[in-house]
């Protein structure tokens, strides 16, 4: 669970038959150095690579942590609008079919596609606007693996947009 105001990720477990939830561990602490977080906003679990991916909203980056031992694996991003630069990223999802990580780069009004192998920049889609395929403060993301779709909450346009997970092209919107 991304615990923004406490600057950490809480790893929880469902215990036993009663469905109780218990704290397993905590990742991160407040700060701007590697393994430190400033308002983590979303997490994605990548079981294929034994890691948890975290969008670090106020540090303008993405951190990768090992699921097994909770060690920091890597950090990418810094504030800006270039290829590996982010501006207050909110959401993150894993596109397993295309071996990509998709980051919701909220204040740059775009989605950033990274390689799930080495976090290299692949491409980005959209920028600010209200037309189909444009965003105004996108905030959340989900992947429909079966239909090869990306579902994005487009906050200030008050809609949800659906894009192709193949190339990020606009498919339809609702809301």
Q: What residue spans do the PLM features occupy?
A:
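Gly/Pro-rich loop segments of beta-rich domains
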Residues: 16-41, 72-90, 121-139, 167-175
């Amino acid at each position: 669970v991304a615990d923004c105001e406490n600057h950490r990720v809480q790893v929880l477990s469902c215990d036993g038959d009663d469905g109780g939830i218990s704290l397993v561990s905590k990742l991160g602490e407040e700060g701007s150095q590697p393994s430190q977080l400033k308002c983590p906003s979303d997490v994605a679990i990548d079981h294929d690579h034994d890691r948890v991916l975290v969008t670090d909203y106020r540090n303008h980056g993405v951190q990768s942590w090992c699921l097994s031992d909770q060690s920091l694996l890597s950090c990418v991003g810094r504030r800006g609008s270039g290829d590996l630069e982010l501006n207050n990223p909110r959401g993150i999802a894993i596109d397993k079919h295309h071996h990509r990580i998709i980051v919701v780069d909220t204040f740059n009004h775009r989605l950033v596609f990274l390689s799930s192998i080495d976090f290299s920049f692949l491409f980005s889609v959209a920028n600010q606007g209200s037309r189909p395929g444009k965003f105004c403060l996108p905030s959340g993301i989900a992947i429909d693996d079966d239909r090869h779709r990306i579902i994005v909450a487009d906050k200030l346009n008050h809609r949800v947009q659906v894009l192709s997970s193949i190339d990020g092209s606009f498919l339809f919107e609702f809301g």
